[in-house]
Amino acid sequence: MLFLLTVLCCSPHRKAEAVIQKEKMVQIMTEVYLIEMHYQKGYGMPSMYKPRLDIALDEIFKKHDVSRKDYESSFSYYAANPKEFLELNELVIQRYNEELVHK
């Protein structure tokens, strides 16, 4: 996950062709972060869980009717705009906390 964040954050600052709207992006990011944490915690080494993680991520993207490419380009767009990216991550944390309270 850190590698993905580093690569995407350091990409050129260009507007994505079809940036995913903030609310939808928050929903997707929340699910992506949770599934990444699950696999990192359970397996430790990326080489052990990468194929399974990719399948799980593809299911998340399919559920939200976006491609991996659309998600990654939108992630890059928001990451290149620190204020918006911070807002997205704060909303992801808020959403995660709300889900914990309602369980």
PLM-predicted stretches and their roles:
Residues 1-4:
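Sec-dependent signal peptide recognition
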Residues 6-9:
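C-terminal motif of bacterial Sec signal peptides marking the signal peptidase cleavage site
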Residues 11-14:
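Bacterial signal peptide processing site
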Residues 19-39:
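Post-signal peptide N-terminal segment of mature Sec-exported envelope proteins
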Residues 43-103:
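Compact alpha-helical subdomains of small soluble proteins
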